Amino acid sequence: MEQIEQHILRLRKQLRHWEYLYYVEAAPEVPDSEYDRFMAELRTLEAERPDLLTADSPSQRVGGQAQSSFGQVRHEVPMLSLDNVFEEPGFLAFDKRVRDRLKRDDDMTYCCELKLDGLAVSLLYENGELVRAATRGDGATGEDITANVRTIRTIPLRLQDHDNLPRLLEIRGEVFMSEAGFLRLNETAKREGSKVFANPRNAAAGSLRQLDPSITARRPLTFYCYGVGLLEDGELPESHWERLQQFKAWGVPVSDRVRRCTGSAAVLDFYRQVHEARLSLGFDIDGVVIKVDSLALQQRLGFVARAPRWAIAYKFPAQEQLTRVRDVEFQVGRTGAITPVARLEPVLVSGAMVSNATLHNADEVERLGLMIGDTVIVRRAGDVIPQIVGVVTSERPAEVRPVAFPTQCPVCSSDVERVEGEAVLRCTAGLVCAAQRKEALKHFVSRRAMDIDGMGDKIIDQLVERELVKTPADLFRLNKEILTRLDRMGSKSAQNLLEALEKARQTTFARFLYALGIREVGEATAVNLAAAYGTLDALIAADIDSLTGVQDIGNIVATHVRHFFEETHNIEVIQDLLSPAIGIRWPEPVAAPVAASDNPFAGKTIVLTGSLSSLSRDEAKDHLVALGARVSGSVSAKTDLLIAGEAAGSKLSKAQQLNIPVMDEAEMMRLLGESSDA
């Protein structure tokens, strides 16, 4: 070996060592100037001898040319998601399921890790050298982000030398951004007039998907390993915890907050400690991941619903923040319900900026004791929907004022009423009210109703505000000249919308009923009504006694249906829609679904949860309903079956607690295929 080649190898080895100490261990050994001197010498030598330049050299981190797109990467070992639990009983139920399946009475040993709030990635090392990096994608196929990942300082381009390196090793983990790095990034973006990110997770994801790797190189990204995928021509320990220690020895970053726990009590103790310390970690986490430590036991437990039976994510309760109520405004919905909405001083809650929260009704405002100007506790229910959970009365200023509910509709000034037995106020004007008209039309054109593609909320708003549309039938009277006068509506878009309107004229009885917007009549109820009566005339003639005999329809829903068809205006709207000029039609009569004796879905109440890869949730729902199932949106003791797709959450946990049978997507698709062939 030449002397210059030996010197280059020594420089690379020294620089890798210093990078590991600086970026992974946070324990720099030399001043930056010394590191820079070695790096400059390495680059000079590599420039002199380009034949000695290798992809894993420390000099090659900061990316080169921009890409035009990301290539696709098929994961040899699928990157599965985890089932979630949100409360202690959910974890204890998981622990019991594990022990029951393994037929063990003794305590299980688990490896507990932080659930990082970043982006899952796969790192493929060949003979210790990083050769490919990919996003998780849909679990089966991800995007090739090798050029960008090579710029992340905490990810080794070459594993530290050891005799036992596998030929192929796929390390999996999370790329994320620290809170301090996120704040610095946004401060710089503000100064430069660039995009400001909402939260560290979005910043990390956006940084990894830059087509120009030099941009990624300037982003403060870091990485923690949490597992392994593909492994060829090599061996690893049979304990997950010991595997993480092995990866750490090879120079791969592993969180120092990984603990091996024996028994559920030890796991719960670790969870509580992490929950208390979460705000001091310096980066976002949203729970603890709990894995059976033994690889042999993991293999025995296997997988279900595209998630392992041997692991669970125990997520933290929704994060809460304090903010102030600036005002309370009132919104009018499709059925005239007047809903109070709190306007808040913007506050970051669980990674999202929150400035509004619904207060539901007067009873909720009274229960909270809320006044305008109050300091309130805000959380995002399920880390999604903002809600006010309490008022900090000790912080109440002198100038607060009560929430005054309107006596007239805030949109059309019509009288409002509160029906006995209901908590909400309602505008009495019906579709005369512009707000109700807008919301009714938005419902009518929605995907699960008449499915008029391209007829978005902003188009409906313009049509109503310009008094171009008053009833659903008016939508079908629109022409290209009218549409092109709307904002942001060109000739091509107008033509596409007219074609969508034409297509929507052919529908189904159930969709049409749902589109009418009858109170309390959702998709499943509309299907049941269509199946029970077959024709619109028969349904219109049905009395309350007849209606209450239909599956899942009680007295309240029956009363709403009866009242809807007793309104002259509603009958006029229906007649207009069905007239030859408009031409809404569907196959008649609609017969009740006939369930084959061997159809496993007939007569069952089924809940769908998680995302499906073979078809959409809506398509799955249509198939199940066609086979005589009732598809519900929530799990209860009356649920017969839960079908769990990828990333199934609290519904899966509740079903398991209630001992409700769970079916994965593959089994559902198999049975749907058999039922359709029958």
Swiss-Prot record:
One of its GO terms (cellular component) is cytosol. It is an enzyme of class 6 (ligase). GO terms for molecular function: DNA binding; DNA ligase (NAD+) activity; metal ion binding. GO terms for biological process: DNA repair; DNA replication. DNA ligase that catalyzes the formation of phosphodiester linkages between 5'-phosphoryl and 3'-hydroxyl groups in double-stranded DNA using NAD as a coenzyme and as the energy source for the reaction. It is essential for DNA replication and repair of damaged DNA. CDD domains: BRCT_DNA_ligase_like, LIGANc. Its cofactor is Mg(2+); Mn(2+). NAD(+) binds at D32, S33, E34, Y35, D36, S81, L82, E113, R136, E174, K291, K315. The active site is at K115 (n6-amp-lysine intermediate). SMART domains: BRCT (SM00292), HhH1 (SM00278), LIGANc (SM00532). This is DNA ligase. The keyword Cytoplasm does not apply. Its EC number is 6.5.1.2.
